[in-house]
Amino acid sequence: MRHFFRTQLIPTEVLRIADEFLPEIGMERTGHTARSRAFAGDLGKLQLSVRKEGGHYTFVEISTDQMGESRLDRNAKKFFLALHKAGDPRHRIEAAY
């Protein structure tokens, strides 16, 4: 599956958070470049890339080798939540109904 997220964090900060977050869920870094990371573990394989996108945004893309809504995909969404919290620590995430 592919997941996308746009954040105000700079690319190096996104990669730093990924390097901290993903090993906590049992993923081991298997490759890296200046703008990407590759992880693998019991949950599957994950590719993460970041790029600057018009103005002050960073576009984050995650691809997994899993089908449907796997545990790895749910953790990718939790990673996006961690990015959101890092970008705006005052914002309180709650249900909107």
Locate predicted features.
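Short, hydrophobic/aromatic-rich segments at coil-to-beta transitions
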Residues: 31-39
